[in-house]
């Protein structure tokens, strides 16, 4: 299979994170440096971050809490733009929360995703982008 979307000489990097805000707290300076060198940087975000804590008291308001997925997505898009991501791909799973939390029982939670289906989606992204470098995490189970 040949890559018809990217020029052959374009260097490409793919970063895979679980939640919005991980792109900012884990490796943002690395992505920014590569982007500044002309590397195409793509981000896969697996969940919407629905179970994330609100650490900023100014954001701990009903209108934020009630719309947390939309707020997290807007934050992610702005953050990705500032860092230098050229593309953001949302896998669309619901945040699973912390281990043994009630959110883990939600059938749409990433923790309940069919591994073959989730892996297949990531593989198709890898095949499309054909990154030279993939940044992700070890299995934390």
Each model region followed by its residue ranges:
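Short, Asp-centered acidic motifs that coordinate Mg2+ and/or phosphate
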Residues: 133
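Short, well-ordered beta-to-alpha junction loops that form the rim of enzyme active sites
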Residues: 91-94, 136-140
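Gly/Ser/Thr-rich loops at beta-strand to alpha-helix junctions
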Residues: 22, 140-141
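Active-site rim/loop-helix segments in enzyme catalytic domains that contact anionic ligands
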Residues: 1-129
């Amino acid at each position: 299979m040949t890559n018809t979307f990217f020029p052959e000489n374009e260097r490409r990097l793919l970063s895979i994170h679980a939640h919005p805000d991980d792109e900012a707290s884990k490796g943002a300076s690395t992505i920014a440096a590569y982007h500044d060198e002309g590397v195409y940087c793509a981000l896969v975000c697996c969940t919407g971050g629905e179970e994330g804590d609100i650490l900023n008291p100014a954001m701990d308001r009903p209108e934020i809490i009630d719309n947390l997925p939309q707020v997290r997505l807007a934050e992610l898009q702005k953050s990705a733009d500032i860092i230098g991501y050229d593309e953001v791909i949302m896998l669309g799973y619901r945040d699973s929360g912390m281990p043994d939390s009630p959110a883990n029982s939600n059938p749409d939670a990433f923790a309940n995703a069919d591994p073959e289906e989730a892996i297949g989606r990531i593989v198709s992204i890898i095949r499309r982008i054909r990154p030279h470098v993939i940044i992700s995490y070890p299995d934390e189970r």
